[in-house]
């Protein structure tokens, strides 16, 4: 069976991921007019820039949908977001600022839940608005087929007939008007935005040029912290985790994770926390650039990693970072539910997150400027009395340390001999009396 359909399957049911925007509206209307039977599915991901979700299915029906459904994906999305924090599943960082993989997380949820809803309705052909140059076309492809092995893919934006007739936004707008719908194009921004309640992505157009900075972006989850005219008073906030799960903010306990994240977004957003500018590698190995917002994810991540460093030993923390980066890349590639990702998730949640219990107090200022004011946990292995510089009882004595240092003579001797060996073969230039490379010796030999 052909998985990807290049032309419209006339007379068949097609499920379209319907956002209500110009692209999917024109595509739905065009498919109906050409003889297909479109079904519209809208994911409620808690997008901060969406005002009326209930109106979206109604518009789909007006444009010719056989049926239109609104699928509430918020609970699942937040669950996956918390799992990503527990695992440190983030691999794109620049200068210490993290991209929290909010779009890949949204695609994992959308791609599985919408296709599951389509399957319930007997719809086995899926279309969405992803383009052939981006990551989403592959993410949706993988998640869709994981959910429904019989699924076929039809994307109007890969159909030459559709492109020839409605290849641009102007043509789409004119098409809608000609069909009796007073659809006006929204005001063109200098970039495009995609969002869910975990975060927002701003990319393309002017942001493709690296001399266009974050300053051209109007945040939808935060504030312009770079604008000195924007008043942002400092604010103290406490975050509490129990067994790796965020449960309370500023002393208020949440039984609903969705409400917890919304509050975290409000707190972090007041300061512009979690905004970052990243150059990343797309799945196809080409580089792209995005500016990201994720105020709630950033707030939870900071508190989580503070507890992590105070609770776990060095080797565990090293494995958390290494496996987290590996898992983040799998998530980015649309492999969040693949076996290799599930293996990493299970180990990180079981052996790392389960011990993260405690409370962190932060002072948030402007943007990603913050201070950690206090860290409290019954599981802390940080114990200041062990290494206090004050006089008193100690868990080890000066003689104990002398013995420990003496044992280091073995590997120090080995290292010294290797340095001399490197010098003899010309790999290093060293002094006559030691094997240690020195700047002046390198300069003298022009190496």
Swiss-Prot record:
GO molecular function: argininosuccinate synthase activity; ATP binding; protein homodimerization activity
Record GO cellular component, one term: cytoplasm
Lineage: Bacteria, Pseudomonadati, Pseudomonadota, Gammaproteobacteria, Enterobacterales
Catalytic activity entry: L-citrulline + L-aspartate + ATP = 2-(N(omega)-L-arginino)succinate + AMP + diphosphate + H(+)
EC number: 6.3.4.5
Enzyme class: ligase
Keyword RNA-binding: no
Database matches in InterPro entries: Arg_succ_synth_type2_subfam, Arginosuc_syn_C, Arginosuc_syn_N, Arginosuc_synth, Arginosuc_synth_CS, Arginosuc_synth_type_1_subfam, AS_cat/multimer_dom_body, AS_multimer_C_tail
Keywords: Amino-acid biosynthesis, Arginine biosynthesis, ATP-binding, Cytoplasm, Ligase, Nucleotide-binding
Natural source organism: Escherichia coli O1:K1 / APEC
Protein name, as recorded: Argininosuccinate synthase
Sites where the protein binds L-aspartate: 131, 135-136
Self-association state and partner proteins as the record states: Homotetramer.
Cell compartments where the protein resides: Cytoplasm
GO annotation (BP), single: L-arginine biosynthetic process
Residue numbers binding ATP: 17-25, 43, 129, 131, 136, 194
Main location group: cytoplasm
